[in-house]
């Protein structure tokens, strides 16, 4: 008799990551310029790697407290105060997680009951929708296209009027995929709007906080600490995507609930990574500075070139992505455009539809790539847009 296994119904409509699926296909094609993943092309700073070696030599290879090592929690608290002027008690308000993804997952699982609704400004990083649905919740999207990808207070009020049983909202700034972020005044306006709904848990994904090009990042925690979970980590700021170090920063009563999920799913984060991360957030508190300047240069080169080719761009002031509107004359949806660009010019980008229906008609390009690769991409995209094939056609279907 064959097995007849049933699965969680919440998974029925959840697909694998379109971004990663496309990237895996693109990797198979020789000489493809890949501008797909949000993967820094810098190496983890040497001093951090040395600390990981030191941890191994000290045999720091056992379980740690589920919340994180005391030294790391203290370093994280200092980092948030020094960088963003928000105070979190390392003993009660901070949780170390397996990257920002686990921080998001544990936070949403902690607040959602079956049928609860969560607001998600759109376009959005696709995991937000998937996690809400896995938790049995219902995502409610707020279209930001008409406001140049900026969430507005009136949009929050409108969504709260139209929907009942809304328990949370997921914010993301600097934003993936658009690169748009908020000034201090804009952040305060959003906080003031959300404060009118004390039942809302505000989950603020601020993983790109160290990459703001004009002004400085302002955390929602400065204005709305009592009802916010701020999510951050070292994947982007310290080029540590594989180390899986993330955090939640929230009031103690919220942190306790998130901790229940974390402890029962993960136990604790890798001990060696935690040791190295302690020094990343102390000795390496400004490690992102040279990366930021390099990203700024790349952004400017890429934005200028794409604009000249007819793409419309909401200028990205943060993260390392460009969200470009496909020129009207292409007569292709975003998926068709991306597949044709890969086939004809061997440049891999992400279709806007991967970030929700509001992303249709756009493509996301990552400038977490060398200037040499960006210039090669510009040359190939230029040839493609002008109707010529600049490179040998690939076999992509």
Please tell me what each predicted stretch does.
Residues 34, 43, 54-57, 62-66, ...:
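Phosphate/diphosphate ligand-binding glycine-rich loop within oxidoreductases
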Residues 1-7, 12-13, 25-29, 33, ...:
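PLP-dependent class I/II
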Residues 63-97:
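Conserved N-terminal alpha-helix of the aminotransferase class I/II PLP-enzyme fold
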